[in-house]
């Protein structure tokens, strides 16, 4: 009778451990790697570009854009998305618009790349 009771308690403990294995209030204990995607641009890189530059000059300074508008407008998008471990996801988008002759006419930096 004692062995049967011991077996039942052991089986119940094993079942309870298996059922609650996925439940954890200690989320930060689990390792999550930093995930960086896109074009990393430092504030120094962003400050090097200005209106009047050609597409070739911009590409030389910043590298190739992550996305170019496929619908005929001369718009380049440099997007950087970062998810550091357990912290909040951040995204920076640098949008550059060129005229028909390939000269930079507009710069949108959201959120702004600032030195920290």
Curated annotation (Swiss-Prot):
It is a lipid-anchor. A lipid is attached at residue 23 (S-diacylglycerol cysteine). Residues 1-22 form the signal peptide. Its main location: membrane. The keyword Transcription regulation does not apply. It is found in: Cell outer membrane. GO terms for molecular function: protein-macromolecule adaptor activity. One of its GO terms (biological process) is Gram-negative-bacterium-type cell outer membrane assembly. GO terms for cellular component: Bam protein complex. A lipid is attached at residue 23 (N-palmitoyl cysteine). It holds the Pfam family BamE. Keywords: Cell outer membrane, Lipoprotein, Membrane, Palmitate, Signal. The keyword tRNA processing does not apply. Part of the Bam complex, which is composed of the outer membrane protein BamA, and four lipoproteins BamB, BamC, BamD and BamE. Belongs to the BamE family. Part of the outer membrane protein assembly complex, which is involved in assembly and insertion of beta-barrel proteins into the outer membrane. This is Outer membrane protein assembly factor BamE. The lineage of its organism: Bacteria, Pseudomonadati, Pseudomonadota, Gammaproteobacteria, Enterobacterales.
